[in-house]
From Swiss-Prot:
InterPro entries: GrpE, GrpE_coiled_coil, GrpE_head. Belongs to the GrpE family. PROSITE patterns: GRPE. This is Protein GrpE. The gene is grpE. The keyword Cytoplasm applies. PANTHER family: GRPE PROTEIN, GRPE PROTEIN HOMOLOG, MITOCHONDRIAL. It comes from Vibrio atlanticus (strain LGP32) (Vibrio splendidus (strain Mel32)). GO terms for molecular function: adenyl-nucleotide exchange factor activity; protein homodimerization activity; protein-folding chaperone binding; unfolded protein binding. It is found in: Cytoplasm. GO terms for biological process: protein folding. The keyword Chaperone applies. It comes from the Bacteria. Keywords: Chaperone, Cytoplasm, Stress response.
Amino acid sequence: MSNEENKVTEEELDQIIAEAEKVEEAELNEESVDEQEAKIAQLEAALLSSESKVKEQQDSVLRAKAEVENMRRRSEQEIDKARKFALNKFAEGLLPVIDNLERAMQAADAENEVVKPLFEGVELTHKTFVDTVAKFGLKEINPEGEVFNPEFHQAMSIQESPDHESNTVMFVMQKGYELNGRVVRPAMVMVAK
């Protein structure tokens, strides 16, 4: 072999080696790209997982806030209700006192000069007492002439009456009372048939 042939062969050999190195480098780059793509896919999956966890946590926080708000509102309503109706049993206990004062005024002879000062004292006591309990929300239910309503009235008897429309209250036997819109005692009434 001559030097020229050797040169060509060496040049070819150098070229082959250079091409082999390029191929090897390209394969390394492909492996590196594959590894990077795998890492990117892993990171994207982790990101999606983190985002879904964040959404779940945000939903949990919103639900917790709503629950706390509902509890606060319920508590306020219960406190308001308790405040309004705390006097219910006390009011029930006072009703016989009002009834007895009214009976005393009905039984007394207001024209009798001996009884008149006593009658006026009972009348004044009754008025003061009724005014005082009214300040705390206790109101009288006196439905004479109204249409019978079982929520506010208790029918003690039903009678025919040409002077009254059917199903109206003819006579109140005992006044009823309500406390802040809630019936403490229904009015005992006689209803027209």
